[in-house]
Amino acid sequence: MGIRIYKSYTPGTRNRSSSDFVEITKSKPEKSLLRKKLSCAGRNNRGLITVRHKGGGHKQRYRLVDFKRNKLDIPAIVASVEYDPNRNARIALLHYQDGEKRYILHPKKLAVGDKIYSGINVPIEIGNAMPLYNVPLGTAVHNVELIPGRGGQIVRSAGTSAQVVAKDGQVVTIKMPSNEVRMIYKNCYATIGEVGNADIKNIRLGKAGRKRWLGIRPSVRGVVMNPCDHPHGGGEGRSPIGRAKPVTPWGKPALGVKTRRQNKYSDFCIIRSRN
């Protein structure tokens, strides 16, 4: 992936950059793998806002992505690399030998025409999925399962990868992108390689409207609100928050407070915390 830098033709392009989409080989998605995606704009079934700063945005259709990789020992050919509006990574369309078509996350350096596999005894090559106990130490993996058969749940974002660092009995130890070190059952599947589109983090939107295209509404600071709207609000002119520590709009402690539940069921899996 490359980044296209815009010249200052207008105020909206002055600080703008975007992907050059050179890795995209097909513009229209596979119709059999599309589903409707309804926008709730952060509201629940009663119409109340449960997630702030959501609303608007371009209409999208969901692409069914195969996170389980459960078609074992059936070769698949990479037919195309496509854009997915629902995630920051690209997706690759696979044509299996038995005629089925599926999307997967597009790993870095996986090209159209490559042949990939899923299974226990498959080659250690980019795009192949296998149990963690068969992955050599030091190998970069992504789309890692937490429970065997459930499908990949972690290390799925663009440019991310985890590293297999140890094997001991029924567990495999991996180092996460956050530098957290944790244990995972050895029968969990993972895909070899790093997720592509790593330069997405270097893109500058350039104007507020591009945020709105993504369905993200403005975030307003509490200190500029009225007292009826936020605990930080009120005062004459530019005034401090008037409290010892910052709080959320509902009065709970914010900024620096640990949000992970104490005695969580998975605490025993974490060898070194990311914090």
Swiss-Prot record:
PROSITE patterns: RIBOSOMAL_L2. One of its GO terms (biological process) is mitochondrial translation. One of its GO terms (cellular component) is mitochondrial large ribosomal subunit. It is found in: Plastid, Chloroplast. Residues 225-252 are annotated as: Disordered. It comes from the Eukaryota. Disulfide bonds: none annotated. The keyword Ribosomal protein applies. GO terms for molecular function: rRNA binding; structural constituent of ribosome; transferase activity. The keyword DNA-binding does not apply. Keywords: Chloroplast, Plastid, Ribonucleoprotein, Ribosomal protein. Part of the 50S ribosomal subunit. Belongs to the universal ribosomal protein uL2 family. This is Large ribosomal subunit protein uL2c. It comes from Guillardia theta (Cryptophyte). The lineage of its organism: Eukaryota, Cryptophyceae, Pyrenomonadales, Geminigeraceae, Guillardia.
